[in-house]
Design a protein with these regions (language model features):
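Acidic catalytic motifs of isoprenoid enzymes
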Residues: 1-192, 196-213, 220, 224-256, ...
Length: 315
């Protein structure tokens, strides 16, 4: 579900691009130092945004340097990096979230690659759970709730269509059918948002409530963006997807995502952010839309809508 919270490179100066890479590389080094070389596979730009956000908000002591990178052996020049205490926390979260993403993949299709990744990350997750037990417990709670929501909807949809082989259960009772028809398309997204909000709020002091609100909105956006991008694959496969269940078109998905993005932007605007402000703006206001605009180019959405102009996120 991650990989959407990235910067719009076209909106950044060269110095901002270098700063972005340095914080990203700092997170990569923190993963290596705290969890070993293999944990670098957990690296994401999503948590890089979190580091930028916390460093700007709290202005902690930051260590900077340059190191050769085994992940990028060419060019041979050392790569600049920047780290703070928030980088270490982001590394812990990266491992925990990646492990549960792998568990989700195993539950979905059980392929060998996912099972191998689960085994490789199990030890690292044990270490992360010792370091951030409350956060890991929250991730476990939320992911279990999401699996229940997604599984219930899949089974309900199959039973309503009479696909007993797919569900291995009898057709739904009248009450169960009514519940299936009245399903809440926001339920799973809300759970993911609640989880990310609580992770964002940890150790934020005075700003805990605002950071939780930001994380909650961003989490809902991430979940829904993942559903939008997977729409074409999930339609024939029958995988849980709230947009498929609702029969949404590109413009309907765009409008729903814009509301979720606004829910993240409102608390973000209330934070006293100065350092890296333009860089973070390029992530939250335009970069997060990159994969959607690639899957659903605005001009294609307009054609689908009969050519009528629509309000849309920045490209």
């Amino acid at each position: 579900m991650f990989g959407f919270v990235v910067a719009d490179a076209g909106a950044l100066s060269e110095d901002e691009k270098e700063r972005y890479r340095a914080v990203y590389c700092g997170l990569c080094l923190a993963l290596r130092d705290r969890y070993g070389q293999l944990s670098r596979a957990c690296l994401t730009y999503d948590l890089t945004f979190f580091v930028l956000l916390c460093d700007s908000l709290h202005e902690p002591v930051e260590t900077q340097g340059a190191s050769h990178c085994v992940m990028h052996p060419a060019p041979a020049a050392p790569r600049p990096w920047a780290r703070s205490a928030w980088t270490d926390y982001a590394a812990d979260l990266s491992v925990a979230l990646a492990y549960h993403k792998v568990l989700d993949d195993v539950a979905d299709d059980g392929d060998l690659a996912a099972r191998a990744a689960e085994r490789l990350l199990a030890g690292a997750y044990g270490c992360a759970r010792a370091r951030i037990p409350k956060q890991c417990a929250e991730i476990e709670r939320a992911m279990a709730a999401i699996r229940t929501i997604e599984g219930s909807r899949r089974n309900s949809a199959a039973a309503l269509s009479g696909d007993a082989e797919a569900t291995c259960i009898s057709p739904l009772s009248a009450d169960a059918a009514d519940a299936a028809l009245a399903f809440d398309p926001d339920a799973a997204a809300n759970e993911f948002g609640r989880m990310l909000g609580r992770l964002f709020a940890c150790n934020q002091g005075f700003w805990a409530e605002t950071m939780e609100e930001l994380g909650r909105g961003l989490g809902r956006f991430i979940y829904l963006m993942d559903a939008a991008v997977d729409f074409a694959d999930d339609t024939p496969s029958g995988s849980y997807n709230p947009f498929v269940a609702l029969g949404s078109d590109a413009e309907a998905m765009r409008a729903t995502l814009a509301l979720a993005a606004a829910d993240a932007a409102a608390p973000y605007e209330r934070l006293p952010l100065v350092q890296d402000a333009n860089l973070m703006d390029a992530i939250l206001y335009s970069g997060v839309w990159a994969q959607f605009n690639k899957a659903y180019p605005p001009q294609a959405a307009l054609a689908q809508n009969g050519g009528s102009p629509q309000s849309e996120p920045p490209n």
